[in-house]
């Protein structure tokens, strides 16, 4: 589609190339993912143990292509990059993938539905098929209002907290509303530079970020931030409200989100009384 024509460096941790290892075991969960479509398999190597160029540029590639066309699907543009790198650069590496498909319930905790072990892409495809069955929820019609609660101890930034957007946006109706209860969020980026760039540009939508990316060197040098800004916007399709304790109304609205005081939000949407699913 001509959205990206840059080269991508294939870099992995040098320890993986140490020939004294006769087996390298990569363990992980296959689950829907906003950048690659379905997480794990070779992503564990090229991103989990990869260099910054690969991480940044594949995040940008996924953002350029669009989350709605990627989430929960195999053979995304990013996955094709990983497949090419696997076939052309590391096929002699003594890798064994151990892939799981799991769900979680309050009653039973983590349930393992599948365990897939081997090196061939076929085992990943089998895990993908099972994960699509177990980890994707389909709704009969788009949702007008969605409330997400972010654990106070786990989510301290919108960099992580915006998973609330990634994981719900395909189910939310045009003109709908997403309310994110985020008692622990106190900054935007996980580091100072990312935080600065998010505050500078905001979550202004895919087309605007692509325009800003072409015009601004600081975004070009921080492609993962540019990708994050794209993923963190609804592109004007539905409203996003952050209910927080530690950021001001001006800070939240400054990055293009709506603001609600946390105490006001929990009076309406008490996470201790609401249950997962429809209420």
Regions found by a protein language model. Give the residues of each.
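An acidic, phosphate/nucleotide-engaging active-site surface
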Residues: 1-37, 252
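Short coil/turn connectors at secondary-structure junctions
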Residues: 19-23, 32, 40-41, 50, ...
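Structural motif
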Residues: 25-27, 145-149, 179
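Short helix/loop capping segments that flank catalytic or ligand/cofactor-binding pockets
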Residues: 26-27, 33-36, 54-58, 106-109, ...
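Mobile "lid/hinge" segments at catalytic clefts and subdomain interfaces of large enzymes
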Residues: 29-32, 39-98
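Membrane-embedded hairpin module used as a gating/binding unit in multi-pass transport
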Residues: 68-154
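Non-transmembrane, aqueous-exposed alpha-helical and coiled segments at domain scale
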Residues: 147-159, 271-276
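C-terminal non-catalytic interaction/assembly regions of soluble proteins
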Residues: 161-279
């Amino acid at each position: 589609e001509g959205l990206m024509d840059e080269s991508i460096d294939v870099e992995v941790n040098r320890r993986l190339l140490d020939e004294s290892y006769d087996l390298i075991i990569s363990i992980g969960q296959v689950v829907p993912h906003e950048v690659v479509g379905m997480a794990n398999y070779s992503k564990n190597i090229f991103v989990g143990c990869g260099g910054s160029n690969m991480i940044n540029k594949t995040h940008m590639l996924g953002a350029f292509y669009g989350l709605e066309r990627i989430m929960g699907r195999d053979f995304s543009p990013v996955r094709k990059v990983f497949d090419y790198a696997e076939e052309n650069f590391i096929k002699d590496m003594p890798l064994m993938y151990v892939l799981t498909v799991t769900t979680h319930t309050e009653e039973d905790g983590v349930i393992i539905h599948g365990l897939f072990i081997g090196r061939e892409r076929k085992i990943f495809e089998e895990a993908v098929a099972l994960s699509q069955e177990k980890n994707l929820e389909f709704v009969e019609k788009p949702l007008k209002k969605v409330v997400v609660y972010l654990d106070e101890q786990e989510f301290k930034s919108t960099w992580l907290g915006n998973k609330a957007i990634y994981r719900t946006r395909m189910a939310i109706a045009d003109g709908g509303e997403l309310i994110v209860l985020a008692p622990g969020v106190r900054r935007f980026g996980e580091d100072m530079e990312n935080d600065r760039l998010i505050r500078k540009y905001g979550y202004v939508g895919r087309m605007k970020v692509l325009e800003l990316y072409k015009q601004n060197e600081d975004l070009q040098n921080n492609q993962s931030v540019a990708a994050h800004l794209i993923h963190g916007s609804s592109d004007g399709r539905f409203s996003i409200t952050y209910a927080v304790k530690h950021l001001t109304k001006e800070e939240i609205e400054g990055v293009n989100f709506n603001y609600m005081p946390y105490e006001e939000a929990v009076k309406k949407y008490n996470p201790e009384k609401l249950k997962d699913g429809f209420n």
